[in-house]
Amino acid sequence: MAKKKSVDLFNESPTPKATAKKSAVKPQKTADKGYSAADIEVLEGLEPVRRRPGMYIGGTDSRAMHHLFAEVIDNSMDEAVAGHASFIEVEFMEGNRLSVRDNGRGIPVDQHPKYRDKSALEVIMTTLHAGGKFGGEAYDTSGGLHGVGVSVVNALASDLVVEVARNQELYQQEFSRGLAKGKLKKVGEAKNRRGTKVSFVPDEDIFGKIQFDPARLYSMAKAKAYLFGGVEIRWCCDPSLIKDKEKCPTEDTLKFPNGLQDYLEEQIGGRAVVTPQ
């Protein structure tokens, strides 16, 4: 039997002739600006975050600014979930200042083995990809951006203060726009206290005149409490900043022993359900 001749559709089809069109845009003569090693920038420290905040928090709008809160509270949540903290305090104050405090182990304040002129606290706050969540020894589970979160908050804050109660001593260090304003200093004793407090004001050079929304902050804190059942989050807000008291109380204790089950029960309310559980 004669073999069937295979048909190559590409060969059989005639090739359309390209019609030359004159470009509507006339090429412009540009001076040769050159491109040398001197044009290669190396951004150090937290400068990349300030130059391109969208790469780290998704933009410079209200949603992005509120994400700063998520990064700070995630560090405290990690301490609570790991069993080292029993509560987290969130306070929103005048001047667009937000603080998050926990009673966890406290950020280490001793000298860092690699950067001997800095404390571990300063390294964490001023260096990208510095933290205790990479090796898996300090934390079994963790949230946030793993070594990026709190340093990004520091980079995008016009004023940030960290207080650490550790080894019965109280330490404090101040920062502005990612840079330390001074060295870590001991400010007192903390015999019956431990943990970390981060207080910050978002930088208007980055976010403009955008203000934190108390109702949104409260909702975010409540969501964290639902997500990690049993963790206690204490909410406090300056009454003068609250526009809708139904959506945001001045004070509240958020603790849900059953976690997401409690959330579902709140959403369902009195409606009939298909199954009892």
Predicted regions and their residues:
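Conserved ATP-binding N-box helix of the HATPase_c
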Residues: 63-87, 149-156
